[in-house]
Amino acid sequence: MLQVEHLTKIFKSGDQEIIAINDLSFSVPVGQFLTIAGRSGSGKSTLLYQLGLLDIPTSGKVLIDDVDMVPVSENERTAVRLNDLGYIFQDYAILPSLTALENTVLPLLMQGYTIAQAEAKAKKALEKVGLLDRINNLPSQLSGGQQQRVAIARAIGHDPKVIFADEPTANL
């Protein structure tokens, strides 16, 4: 389960403080979806960065399976990010010199999978997003929507407990 308690994120710019997230609390049970909607600049991406442990909130808790991730060490947060979380970023930035398969395999290798394991998981993920027939294509040979699906395959390849998606269908 993902649980957020009194989450606040304040950015400082000189003498000014910009409150991006103010005392937010909610929980998302296992197997459930949560959609966050709001206008541009309302803090949606900032919230995802806090939830995904890519940034530290000013105050509050982010609990994954009842463990508060805010006070743990950066090494522990990195391990959770690599093993338990999947990310689909608004600007997905797949690597232009790698094929769809290689782009999907790379994060799995970083997580410690063998090449054979990583390729099998990557092919399964690419099949789920309908790109098994394009695994040898470079990003320049894929449409924007297909590139977005490679990013989705990367996010789901290791069967994460939680997936964070920032406008995941923007290019589809």
Q: Can you describe what each PLM-predicted range is?
A:
Residues 1-172:
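ABC family nucleotide-binding domain
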